[in-house]
C-alpha cells in the first residue's frame, strides 16, 4: 500500500497491491480497507488508524517498555563499523550527560572487517571485542541500557552459516549477501537461538533487528514444493520467525526493547517491535518527527 503526490494535477495517487507472492494456491482471503474522509489533521487520522488496527485480535501490539520512549544513542552515525572501546565509552558518558538512556551498538561489533559489507554476517560472534559481555557491563555501569544490531536476513558467503545452510536461501544474488529462507524451521530456530544466546550471555536490554523487508520474493526464489519447508508464504514465515524471537527474548527480559525502522513498520510489525525509528536520519528534526 502506498501513495504519491503529483504536482501537475494536485492529486494524491494511492495504490494497493495484493498477492505479491502469487506463486502458490490460495483458497480464500478477506481484507478490510479503511478510507478516512473526515476533515481532520493527518496526525489524528494516523492515531485513529493505529487504534483501529488494535481492534484486530491477530494484530495486538507488543508491550512497550518505558525505555523505548527515552532518547537512544546509535553508534552507526558516529562510528559506522569502526568501533573502538575507549572512544565508545567516552561517547556513552557524554550521551548519558545529555539525557540519553540507552544505546544500540550497531554494525561492526561482530567483525573486524570495516568494508561496510555483510560478507561475515550469519555467525554473529563478537570478533572485534575480546570480552563483549564486559563492554556491555561497562556501558551499563555508565547508566545506559544496551542493545545490539543484527542484519537478520543476511548470511555472508565468508560465514560458517553460509556453508551450513547452503541451498536454504531466498536468493544468493542480493547486493549485500545471500538472504536466509525463513520458510525452513531450522533457519528460524537458528536465528532465534543466536538472539537468545546473546541476550543471556551479554545481559542485553534490547535488539535492533534490521533489514526485515529483505525477506521477500526475488526472481530466483523457489516456490516449488519442498519437504524441508513448513511454509509456502514468505510473509507467514517471517511472522513466525519474529513472533518466536519476540516470545523467547521476553522470557529472558520482559522489558526487552526490539527496534525496527519505519520503512517496514505497520500493523503486523507492531506485534513484535516496540521501538520504532523513523529512518536513517541523523540531525534531521523534521524526518525524526
Task: Set out the residue ranges of the language-model regions.
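An acidic-aromatic substrate-binding cleft motif
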Residues: 52-94, 98-102, 106, 110-111
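Short conserved micro-motifs at the rims of enzyme active sites and ligand-binding pockets
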Residues: 44-45, 83-85, 270-271
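Residues at alpha-helix termini
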Residues: 13, 19-21, 97, 141, ...
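Aromatic- and carboxylate-enriched substrate-binding clefts and catalytic-loop regions
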Residues: 104-289
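N-terminal accessory beta-strand-rich subdomains and adjacent acidic, glycine-rich linkers
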Residues: 1-55, 59
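Hydrophobic side chains in beta-strands
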Residues: 33-35, 75, 260
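A generic structural signal for short, non-catalytic loop/turn and secondary-structure boundary residues
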Residues: 7-9, 26, 66, 141, ...
